[in-house]
Amino acid sequence: MRRVVLMMSTSIDGFVTGPRGHAGALPEPEELKRWKLERIRRAGTHIMGRVTYEEMAAHWPTSTDDYAAPMNAIPKVVFSKTLDEATWPESSVARGDLADEIASLRRQPGGEIIAWGGADFAQSLSRAGLVDQYVLVIQPVAFGGGLPMFRDLPDALRLDLIESQTFDTGTVLHIYRPSDQASPPGG
């Protein structure tokens, strides 16, 4: 059974975006970029909410960035009740119950399922207990407010740190799994 891996970038104070919207691009350490590219290339499916889908679908098809090829080639599922169709190649729309749709994706063959967010989608996955691994890239910036990574959780989300890496820029990569889970397949 495939695992769901949530990949998110946050500020040191836990916000996905600042009080005025999008966080903006901070310099990405080359070592982190190589790590992320390898992880993305191994993925079997990318999942995301509508807003993230629309941002990515507008960017990746014409991008020359190193991430573009795997982002365009790997199947993507956008979770939305309002999106009529997914026009980004290798994309489809899931409109059913979140837990049922994720269960169906887990049963399919292939690599891990990477969830990209946005924050509302990430929170829905977390509240439903559907995330097997959290890959958090903590940027060396504080927003003092904005859109939080976690909110409205029914209970405390207890996590076990399974990997941590610090980069010269001050960016830190933390990988967690929910404390109540045994080691998921592949990690």
Sequence positions of predicted segments:
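Enzymes that bind and transform nitrogen-containing heteroaromatic metabolites
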Residues: 1-187
